[in-house]
Amino acid sequence: MHSSRRDAFHPVNGQPLASLSMTPKGFTVTTAPWYDDAREAASKRPVAERPTTYETGQRIAQFIAGPWLHAEHVEAVVSTGVQGVVFHGTGLGHLPIDDPQNDAPENALLWRILTRCVNRELPVVIVNQCIHGPVDMNVYSKGRKQQAMGLLGHGVSSTPEAMTAKLHWVLSQNINVKEALSSNLCGEHRETLRE
């Protein structure tokens, strides 16, 4: 991934969807067989002039985990009535929620606000800041603590943008968020993504 090179559009955690061949007479697009199969298996829907499967009033907040992530910021945004929160976790999907040496009280405050969010049934989803690899909350105790808190995202290997769009769609359909986020709706959770 690069901001200005021609290979800036390599797929993340996946294989190319298609290849493009250009000649002086024009170009041809050859889609990958697995993508053709996925397109055939996808549900058909009519083309519309405005969104029909997304509730346009849904609001999803996003935060990036790091030393600047503070509970009062999360609380202020959550108080505006968002329908979901996506956190870009570090490494395997961790958030700064522990204070083992009693020198990071802001982490304990973040843990409290996240617990309140989950208790209010506000979906809190962890995605990965890393370009490659899944969120794996089973490796370290912090990840297991996050799962026990009710934070979602274990096993997610899609990009933050794809997961945010998926959360928006799931909330718009009024279906079970936890089940839908762990399911494969359109190829975002293919096993090959976890390599």
Predicted regions mapped to residue ranges:
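C-terminal non-catalytic interaction/assembly regions of soluble proteins
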Residues: 76, 89-195
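Accessory alpha-helical/coil subdomains and C-terminal extensions
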Residues: 1-97, 188-195
